[in-house]
Amino acid sequence: MDNIKKVKALSIWIFIVPFVATNTCLILITQFHELFPNKENIIHFTFPYIDGGASISRTARYFPTYLVFKPAMFLTAYLLIKYWIFNKQIILNIHGNHKHLKKMLFFGIGSAICLVIHSIFLGIKFDIDAYKLFRRVIMLAFIIFEICLLYTSPSPRDFV
């Protein structure tokens, strides 16, 4: 029962931390232009939730916004790892050894690691094609891991 409370609390924090970080970056880059040393990095008059004028990556890749975004993503990745470990313990307590439990843990922690790697390299510019490919592969791996989690996570019918 204690693990269920931990998972509930972690779920809320896994939502709040990135939400606050991305919106803080958006506010900084659209409203506080004097903080940015390179004026071509600022964004004018956009509300990306409506007009799609900026991506999360675009708002978080420049100084000083990456000072907010990167630590928040590291914290989120840590919380995600704890989340999947506690979920594993909950499933072991309820169901015993589920057939996809190890895969679920692998893909959950793998996606958190991909998030960390992506956050580390966000905002770093190299004009090397291998570097650009590496960044895309990391994002693709993150997405694939999340999709695999959908198929490996137990559903309520597995516990009947």
Show which residues each predicted segment covers.
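Membrane-embedded alpha-helical bundles of multi-pass transporters/translocases
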Residues: 104-111
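Alpha-helical transmembrane segments and their helix-start/interface "positive-inside/aromatic belt" motifs
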Residues: 3-19
